């Protein structure tokens, strides 16, 4: 069992109030010495969170480190993919242009960059201008420190759920970085494509760990608490699997159904808490669990097809 999960079963289940992003980030950084690896950090961060928003932020940062192991634990980062048209390869209009002096010029705009307003480094997805022929554009990821000349971050309106977690519009005009800022490998196949799977795994780990702490603190039924633990073990194990593999995607689809059932089972427990602020936040933030549901269903369907099997009927 992941040592971080053992800690969740033994530590006092009270969490301190987290005031803002800076306060959460200080707490998350402090977990590094006691949480070895991205899955452990997702669990530890979720358990320490006083609400779903900070659990989500913890899972998101853990997912980035699972995707990019060289990313410093002490650097708040944001993955900049989505643009005005969406996040598919053909939607990416941001360009990365190699210059004669060996530098790279980045131009474009991103939207809904999670934790963007508070990040110290942005991981920006763009198409190589020299490879703009027919077919899927060649995407790369550039690591850009904040601030950098030519980079402007605009805070976007809060979302209706987890409004504590800020998002940014990222504007790039004649932004220049060294060629060494490019991460190795294809930007889509190595980073964008697997990130949804990795993010689903680590954000769910964090939210389940948050719910486990609340269940212990509120002395909710043992069967519910034990199911949370079992599901955390399941997701912790899945987080070690190949994020590209169809078998991982099929198993993740089933695991997410189990997690969502637990979220539904938690609803009457929160309702019984009355006007408790934590319960009211949970009701508000529950919409987070339905985001990208269609994309997850499509991922599972494609996984079955890649396995040469007919997808099961039903949801």
Model-derived segments and their meaning:
Residues 64, 142, 211:
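Residue-level signal for inorganic ion chemistry
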Residues 1-41, 201-315:
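Alpha-helical interface subdomain recognition
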Residues 75, 90, 118-120, 138, ...:
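A generic structural signal for well-ordered coil/turn residues at beta-strand boundaries
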């Amino acid at each position: 069992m992941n040592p971080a999960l053992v800690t969740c079963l033994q530590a006092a289940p009270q969490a301190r109030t987290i005031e803002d992003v800076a306060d959460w980030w200080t707490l998350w950084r402090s977990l590094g010495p006691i949480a070895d690896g991205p899955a452990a950090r997702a669990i530890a961060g979720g358990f320490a969170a006083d609400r779903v928003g900070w659990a989500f932020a913890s899972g998101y940062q853990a997912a980035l480190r699972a995707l990019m192991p060289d990313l410093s634990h002490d650097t708040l980062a944001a993955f900049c993919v989505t643009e005005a048209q969406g996040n598919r390869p053909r939607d990416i209009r941001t360009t990365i242009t190699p210059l004669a002096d060996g530098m790279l010029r980045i131009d474009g705009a991103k939207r809904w960059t999670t934790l963007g307003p508070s990040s110290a480094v942005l991981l920006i997805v763009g198409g190589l201008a020299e490879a703009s022929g027919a077919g899927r554009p060649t995407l790369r990821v550039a690591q850009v420190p904040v601030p950098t000349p030519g980079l402007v971050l605009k805070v976007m309106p809060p979302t209706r759920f987890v409004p504590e977690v800020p998002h940014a519009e990222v504007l790039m005009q004649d932004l220049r970085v060294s060629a060494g800022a490019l991460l190795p490998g294809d930007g889509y196949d190595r980073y964008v494509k697997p990130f949804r799977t990795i993010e689903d795994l680590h954000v769910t780990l964090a939210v389940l760990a948050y719910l486990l702490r609340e269940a212990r603190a509120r002395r909710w039924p043992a069967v519910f608490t034990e199911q949370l633990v079992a599901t955390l073990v399941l997701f912790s194990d899945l987080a070690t699997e190949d994020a590209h593999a169809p078998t991982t995607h099929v198993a993740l689809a089933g695991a997410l159904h189990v997690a969502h059932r637990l979220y539904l089972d938690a609803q009457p427990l929160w309702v019984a808490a009355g006007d408790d602020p934590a319960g009211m936040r949970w009701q508000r933030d529950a919409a987070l669990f339905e985001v990208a549901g269609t994309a997850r269903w499509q991922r599972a369907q494609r996984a079955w097809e890649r396995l040469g099997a007919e997808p099961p009927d039903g949801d």
